[in-house]
Amino acid sequence: MAATQELLLQLQKDNRDGRQRKQELEKLMRGLEAESESLNQRLQDLSERERSLLRRRSQAAQPLQGEAREAARERAERVRRRLEEAERHKEYLEQHSRQLQEQWEELSSQLFYYGGELQSQKSTEQQLAAQLVTLQNELELAETKCALQEEKLQQDALQTAEAWAIFQEQTVVLQEVQVKVMEAAEELDAWQSGRELCDGQLRGVQYSTESLMEEMARADRETRLFGGPRALAIRRCVLGALQVLLTLPLLFLGLSLLWTVLLDPGAVSAWLWSLTSETTLRRLRYTLSPLLELRANGLLPT
């Protein structure tokens, strides 16, 4: 754009110089026209004088006698010399007139050339101005697109930051739930141990009871153990924790994958490849170890 403006300024300067040169040539042409008119008038005067001298010569050519003839001869000689001088002056004026005509033709051709060059400069200047306007419009459009893309990226970054904050909050909640689940599992283990001890004492006291009554008592204990309000609440808590454990990693994985695809699509394959590394598998075992402990404690189905 700077080169275009510089070229436009140079063309404007050349245009001003051409106009100034044109004015100078027009002024010189007016002077030459005035001088040519003056020379033509002088040439006409000399021609008139020549005709007058010729008439006087013809009149003086009549037969004279004595001194009158001699005087007439002298006057005729002077007239002849003057005619020769007038003829030479006429030739000089004609030559000068031809030179002026040649100069006039040269000036006319220069004026035509500069006039055409000025028209060409004006056309080029108009084209450059149109190109400059087009470039300015394209620049404004590109700046608008860049601003929109920047605003979109800022919104995406803000959404990602909000999702990350929500994920961290849910992670803290998940850790608290996991601690509570472990505590509940320990309480359930202790409660089951106490019930088993009580059941053993009861079986020692009622050893002589009929087998049918023993089966009914065992079924009743199992119903109270696994169908009571406390066991149902613990089971619901465990299931809710499992749902949170399964939902949060998937949510974080989806957000990370979406952000990575937006920034660098080529990094997705490298990221998927890193999921199968030994470090990732070790972290997965460490994350799933509490679930294995819950299954060992009888809180998860086998």
From Swiss-Prot:
GO terms for cellular component: membrane. Residues 5-160 form a coiled coil. Residues 1-21, 54-73 are annotated as: Disordered. It is a single-pass membrane protein. It comes from the Eukaryota. Its main location: membrane. The chain crosses the membrane at residues 238-258. It is found in: Membrane. Keywords: Coiled coil, Membrane, Transmembrane, Transmembrane helix. Belongs to the TMEM191 family. This is Transmembrane protein 191C. It comes from Homo sapiens.
